[in-house]
């Protein structure tokens, strides 16, 4: 079946058509890349060819075929010389000198029909799709193991909704009543200052590690209606998991850049997820466990820390 659905991209929402197959999770890997792209400005595109090169996952003998050639190659089944080292190919019979040279270098060239070439191209596409999924969708897979919904939905839904589903499931499991929703009020947000305009050299960047989640955990900023402490326990677990991935990314940065980038990509969805608890907490008209005073305490504490930096 096919139905209209929505993809949550940081602060934006994009409509798309979701294909569903009973008993399966149908995932479009480009959605995972788009979600990472929304918070990582170094990712300039979401296409498979670009993103595979971006994560250094492209095979040296990767076969590329222009989309206009796929049909003719497969239907005509003409012969090609395939370079097994770099994936490039030449049509047999165009130049006799090329044919002679390729026939002698059996260690580099092999003769292959167009339909087999197309199959190799499609196999490479599938292999790269799996590699991209391993890089960008593991955070969603981790969340899907805990949240009472499908992996398919977790891969596209907003993070505030995930917290709501987690707490609803927790309450149902432990026989807890759902708190009454409250009304939303205005409060002072984060600290923002522009001290200089223009071009600067020797810029020093200072950053807090997971500022809002850390404030909640260190200062115990959680609503009283969470009588079992579920929000604190889950936030602590996900924050520690993200820090572990960040530390592993730093540890392997000089010795194994590929592994370092893999851990870096895995921590991105978790970063969004743990930071979104503040958003959920500050929206009591939507999130039943929200508390405006708790949200205001988090931003107030954050401003104080920034002034002391």
Region spans (language model):
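Short coil/loop linkers at secondary-structure junctions
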Residues: 57-59, 177, 222
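Non-transmembrane amphipathic alpha-helical segments
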Residues: 235-252, 270
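Common nucleic-acid-contacting/processivity interface regions adjacent to the catalytic cores
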Residues: 71-219, 260-308
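Cytochrome P450 catalytic domain signature, combining two hallmark sequence patches
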Residues: 220-229
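Active-site-proximal helix-loop-helix substrate-binding element of RNase H-like nuclease domains
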Residues: 1-126
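Charged, low-complexity interaction regions
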Residues: 253-257
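Hydrophobic residues within well-ordered, non-membrane alpha-helices that form the packing/core
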Residues: 33, 52, 56, 133, ...
């Amino acid at each position: 079946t096919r139905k209209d659905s929505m993809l949550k991209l940081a602060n934006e929402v994009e409509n798309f058509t979701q294909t569903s197959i009973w008993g399966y999770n149908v995932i479009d890997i480009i959605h995972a890349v788009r979600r990472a792209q929304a918070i990582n400005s170094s990712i300039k595109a979401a296409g498979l060819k670009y993103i595979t090169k971006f994560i250094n996952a492209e095979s040296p003998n990767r076969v590329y075929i222009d989309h206009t050639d796929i049909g003719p190659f497969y239907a005509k089944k003409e012969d090609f010389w395939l370079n097994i080292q770099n994936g490039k190919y030449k049509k047999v019979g165009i130049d006799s000198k090329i044919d002679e040279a390729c026939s002698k270098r059996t260690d580099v060239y092999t003769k292959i029909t167009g339909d087999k070439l197309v199959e190799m191209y499609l196999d490479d596409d599938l292999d790269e799709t799996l590699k991209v999924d391993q890089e960008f969708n593991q955070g969603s897979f981790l969340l899907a193991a805990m949240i009472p919904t499908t992996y398919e939905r977790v891969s596209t839904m907003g993070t505030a909704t995930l917290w709501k589903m987690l707490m609803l499931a927790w309450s149902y499991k432990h026989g807890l009543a759902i708190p009454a929703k409250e009304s939303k009020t205005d409060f002072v947000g984060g600290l923002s200052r522009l001290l200089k305009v223009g071009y600067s050299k020797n810029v020093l960047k200072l950053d807090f590690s997971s500022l809002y989640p850390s404030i909640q955990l260190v200062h115990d900023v959680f609503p009283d209606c969470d009588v079992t402490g579920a929000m604190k326990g889950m936030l602590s677990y996900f924050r520690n998991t993200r820090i572990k991935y960040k530390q592993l990314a730093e540890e392997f940065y000089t010795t194994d850049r590929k592994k370092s980038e893999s851990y870096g990509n895995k921590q991105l969805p978790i970063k969004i997820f743990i930071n979104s608890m503040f958003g959920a907490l500050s929206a009591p008209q939507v999130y039943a466990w929200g508390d405006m005073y708790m949200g205001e305490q988090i931003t107030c504490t954050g401003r104080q820390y920034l002034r002391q930096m």
